[in-house]
């Protein structure tokens, strides 16, 4: 803030003559700067010592002195920004840049992408919105989920290649023959980000805190109790076998923060700043796995960089650009893929909506070309043909005598593409004689709302990170959507079916059983996927090791910058 005030005062001195020499009294300068004569003399002395201007005072009160400017406010601002970066004051950079929002792109351009600051490799990512606080348990946004995975660790984690759980805070685990006891053996060299040694009691306490959350209690519903059975061992005792347990513990929602300090973890990066304008991560010197190659990663929250009229493809969160938005022609795509996650439609059968009427709605969506012609941005989405690869969408020949209800109600939440989808579906069903009432829930999930209670149709977004089959099991088990899709007996039957699936020790059998559950949901016209996203990551030359993750981000621990040439 001090830099910002000094720049403001310098601009007030400069503006009346646009930088030309001035003959002026100290009193006039004090009035211009909204301060006392004594203070303006201090400002002039400090600015002259810094080499910004020359001030030749005349003896005597009220005498006019000579003021000559040596630098422009623009060059001074840039110098201040560089100085702030070199001293680790990124917040000052953003405050200085906001002085001229029309020039924000030009001002920030030199500081984006990969930079070496004081021999420290730093990656700066411009981002289109403030990040939401990192709360324990489930998080709604992809960026927040990814960030949690960089800051916190779980007892287990998902292998990048196989998508199966492997050791993390626990180096190994053992399961009893009946599947009711799981022993997790902790690494002996674990440290929290604040330098404290990790104790089994810390992790035990945080796990018990997580189980107080309703969604996590539902996720771990088979857990009877958790005990510290040895200073290096945590043991889970179960009511019934749950061969998803290692998967559940590897999911970001089960990652473990310090029991007293919820933003201190054990992950590869520690959180050093979290504001609405800037989020900064620095590598954890005592990380227990492979150390990051970057020292720091920064999210610069700069929404003006992402206005539509700028023509930047990184406006949308599924298209991440690392680097300089003003020079997109120099930024090349380094990784891309189709998301496993999807936007979906669920249908609540009732006296208002029969099975064949629901099937007709789904058939209209998938067979009319509606999804292929949504106006949501070029190459942003692709129509879904399967829930997961190999889990194909059924097709029906709907009898001609099946007519849609006169009225239906649709409730949906973000992302923004579902605005367009809802409007197109409304128009399409109107042509079939069905009036569709649309209700928008302005959130990224179904938490904290009862709007679904009155809905025949519901649309939302199902993010899928690692282990897609397990993620869908977790979705059915924990999402508050499903009690509104089914009546009470059907929902209880669904949960019992999931319980029967989880007791299967063989992974392939579990996957096949879960596939059968979702195939039945699609056959019953309870669920259909709508479209998937094209994930893209672009980076300028010199940012290496960028690998697309299943959430559409990139693994911070693998990115690296070559040393600057001498």
Segments from the language model and where they lie:
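Long beta-strand-rich cores associated with HINT superfamily self-processing modules
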Residues: 539-566
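Extracytoplasmic/peripheral linker and loop segments enriched in polar/acidic and small residues
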Residues: 475-540
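Surface-exposed binding/hinge segments that line
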Residues: 66, 216-260, 266-273
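Periplasmic-binding protein-like
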Residues: 350-392, 520-526
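Ligand-site clamp/hinge motif
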Residues: 286-329
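Aromatic- and charge-enriched surface segment that lines or borders ligand/interaction sites
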Residues: 19-22, 41-43, 140, 172-215
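A bilobed periplasmic-binding-protein/Venus flytrap-type ligand-binding module shared by bacterial periplasmic
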Residues: 282-285, 336-360, 373
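N-terminal lobe/hinge region of extracytoplasmic solute-binding protein
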Residues: 126-175
């Amino acid at each position: 803030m001090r830099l910002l005030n000094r720049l403001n005062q310098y601009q007030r001195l400069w503006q009346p003559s646009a930088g030309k020499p001035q003959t002026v009294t100290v009193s006039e300068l004090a009035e211009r700067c909204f301060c006392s004569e004594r203070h303006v003399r201090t400002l002039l002395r400090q600015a002259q010592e810094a080499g910004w201007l020359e001030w030749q005072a005349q003896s005597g009160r009220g005498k006019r002195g000579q003021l000559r400017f040596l630098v422009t406010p623009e060059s001074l601002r840039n110098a201040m920004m560089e100085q702030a970066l070199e001293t680790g004051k990124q917040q000052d950079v953003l405050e200085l840049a906001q002085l001229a929002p029309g020039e924000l792109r030009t001002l920030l351009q030199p500081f984006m992408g990969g930079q070496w600051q004081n021999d420290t490799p730093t990656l700066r990512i411009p981002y289109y919105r403030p990040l939401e606080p990192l709360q324990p348990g489930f998080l709604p946004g992809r960026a927040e989920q990814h960030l949690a995975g960089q800051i916190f660790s779980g007892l287990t984690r998902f292998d990048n290649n196989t998508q199966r759980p492997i050791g993390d805070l626990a180096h190994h685990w053992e399961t009893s023959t009946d599947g009711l006891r799981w022993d997790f053996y902790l690494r002996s060299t674990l440290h929290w980000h604040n330098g404290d040694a990790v104790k089994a009691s810390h992790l035990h306490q945080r796990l018990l805190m997580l189980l107080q959350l309703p969604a996590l209690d539902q996720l771990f519903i088979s857990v009877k109790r958790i005990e510290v059975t040895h200073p290096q061992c945590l043991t889970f005792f179960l009511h019934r076998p749950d061969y998803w347990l290692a998967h559940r513990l590897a999911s970001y929602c089960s990652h473990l923060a310090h029991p007293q300090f919820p933003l201190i973890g054990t992950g590869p990066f520690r959180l050093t700043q979290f504001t609405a304008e800037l989020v900064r991560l620095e590598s954890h010197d005592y990380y227990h796995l492979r150390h990051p190659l970057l020292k720091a990663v920064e999210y610069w929250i700069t929404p003006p960089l992402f206005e539509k009229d700028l023509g930047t493809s990184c406006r949308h969160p599924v298209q991440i650009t690392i680097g300089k938005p003003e020079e997109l022609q120099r930024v090349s795509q380094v990784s891309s893929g189709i998301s496993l996650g999807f936007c979906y439609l669920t249908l609540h059968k009732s006296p208002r909506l029969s099975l064949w009427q629901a099937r007709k709605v789904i058939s209209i969506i998938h067979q009319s070309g509606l999804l292929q012609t949504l106006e949501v941005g070029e190459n942003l989405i692709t129509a879904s043909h399967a829930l997961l690869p190999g889990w194909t969408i059924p097709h029906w020949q709907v009898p001609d005598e099946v007519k849609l209800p006169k009225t239906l109600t649709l409730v949906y939440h973000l992302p923004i593409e579902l605005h367009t989808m809802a409007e197109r579906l409304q128009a399409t069903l109107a042509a079939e004689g069905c009036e569709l009432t649309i209700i928008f829930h302005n959130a990224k999930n179904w938490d904290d709302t009862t709007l679904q209670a009155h809905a025949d149709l519901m649309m939302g977004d199902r993010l899928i990170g690692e282990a897609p089959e397990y993620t869908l099991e977790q979705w059915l088990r924990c999402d508050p959507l499903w009690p509104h899709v089914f009546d009470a007996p059907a929902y209880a039957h669904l949960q019992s079916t999931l319980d029967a699936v989880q007791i299967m020790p063989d992974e392939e059998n579990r996957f096949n059983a879960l596939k059968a559950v979702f195939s039945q949901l699609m056959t019953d016209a309870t669920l259909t996927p709508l479209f998937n996203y094209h994930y893209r990551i672009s980076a300028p030359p010199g940012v290496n090791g960028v690998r697309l993750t299943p959430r559409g981000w990139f693994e911070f621990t693998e990115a690296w910058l070559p040393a600057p040439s001498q």
